[in-house]
Amino acid sequence: AGIMITASHNPAKYNGFKAYGPDGCQMTDDAAAIVYDQIQKTDVLTGAKYISFAEGVAKGLIQFVGEDCKEALYEATEARQVRPGLCKTAGLKLVYSPLNGTGLVPVTRVLSDIGITDITIVPEQEYPNGYFTTCSYPNPEIYEALEKGLELAKKVGADLMLATDPDADRVGIAMKCPDGSYELVSGNEMGVLLLDYICAGRIEKGTMPKNPVAVKSIVSTPLADLVAKYYGVELRHTLTGFKWIGDQIAQLEANGEEERFIFGFEESYGYLAGSYVRDKDAVVGSMLICEMAAYYRSIGSSIKQRLEEIYAQYGRFLNQVDSYEFAGLSGMDKMAGIMNTLR
């Protein structure tokens, strides 16, 4: 079990922690309730113990992740390529922003490993800054978080602009159109595009497992159901929250069938293509988005053109996501009241 200290894709004032179980998946409700109950029993003035970071290291209570672990993660991520080697000759030109978060090293390392080296980083958003001074809401779902990246993409003529949120589990993109403008791709659109690309590519390469499984949240586009059915993939539906997608992987693993899992996504820009981790992963998402762009470019097509072909085949699905903020403890109570009324 462990925690990740992060504000995620939210404003800095929401800095807190995500709790993970021993399988690397965010805790589901029953386990989280046990942790929350213990927190409620702790007196914040007398019950919480404190030592300095340096003392924690000296006592062996804090240990740094070794290079062997990092290399294993990179290897597992790069193993999820659908068409290995394709990107080395694609000549893809990319602008990337880690939005002052943690994505810079892992994203650029993996992209470089698979052959994408023409990467321009948004300079103001290159290095970690927990105050998010360049955009107060570092969520790649919203236009404001992508503004600096889009400006730079237009300046250098990039084929794609990618942005990962500060804890690098969500990735947003803008694609270059024939007229030189840039069009944002929604999480629903990208989820369907990646599902289609992975299915078609793995069938072509003979790497599709028997009885493949994909997973999406119930609030994500039903277009994915049609795509999955076309390719003979079982598509499972979960409640909102990637922990439930991770839980589906755990259920497959319990039966020795985790290799059946090929892809999971949520409309909120979260993607995962493998069982090596149990949370949405912007590193593998960025890699597959770039590979997909390189592939369509190599056959004289584009991400935009493939999306239109998908709509022509299955029908056009329009989606709109509205976000509402309920601040503080009173906001949590208000949200709970709204949900109870809906139920």
Explain the meaning of each model-derived region.
Residues 7-10, 94, 98-110, 166, ...:
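Conserved phosphate/anionic-ligand binding catalytic regions in large, soluble enzymes, centered on
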Residues 27-28, 177-203:
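Cysteine protease catalytic core and zymogen-processing segment of caspase-like enzymes
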Residues 1-43, 139-163, 168, 192-198, ...:
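Phosphate/diphosphate-binding loops
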Residues 154, 158-160, 181-183, 201-343:
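Phosphate-binding and adjacent anionic-ligand microenvironments
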Residues 15-153:
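Gly/Ser/Thr-enriched, mixed-charge loops and adjacent short helices
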Residues 26, 30-34, 68-72, 101-106, ...:
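Conserved active-site and cofactor/substrate-binding residues in soluble primary-metabolism enzymes
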Residues 6, 10-12, 47-51, 121-126, ...:
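Core alpha/beta catalytic barrel or barrel-like domain that forms the active/cofactor pocket
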Residues 13-19, 40, 105-110, 131-135, ...:
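Short acidic, glycine/serine/threonine-rich loops at helix termini
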